Amino acid sequence: MKEIDVGFTHVAFVVRDLENSIDFYSRYAGMEVVHSREPDLPEARKVAWLSDRIRPFALVLVQVDAVTDTPLGNFGHLGVACSSIEEIDNKVAMARMEGILRKEPAQAGEPVGYYVFFADPDGNTLELSYGQKVGIEAFRQDDRVPAS
């Protein structure tokens, strides 16, 4: 019997340069390539699936000849939780040097926590956060995670 994946599995972004995007998400979001292929079609020259290997979810990056998708913009974003404020601040310093800091870090209290926005190589926004409760609350509603 084949395994069937059910539920929320991935988010896909169209990119101009797959290697550049892999480098960005590896350095800023701690993701690694778990699958790659080169269909060499105009709508999918190269494909990579990235994961943090913490949860069963992937960021799918697809390199195309012409990017026509609308970037997520300044607020629409991919959110990644970090293990400390210091980890975020170290990446903020890198982002400042690379000119990709989209919004200064902010402490918004519960349930948002400490967060910052960066621009990825294709204009999408990556949010790094510490202390956000998004994933935990999603499971708590289903009694899978005990209240702290």
Regions found by a protein language model. Give the residues of each.
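Vicinal oxygen chelate
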Residues: 1-4, 8-16, 48-53, 68-148
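Core segments of cupin and vicinal oxygen chelate
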Residues: 12-56
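Conserved segment of winged-helix/HTH DNA-binding domains
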Residues: 55-63
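A short beta-turn/loop motif at secondary-structure boundaries
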Residues: 39-42, 68, 107-111
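Short beta-strand/turn micro-motifs at beta-sheet edges
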Residues: 1, 62-68
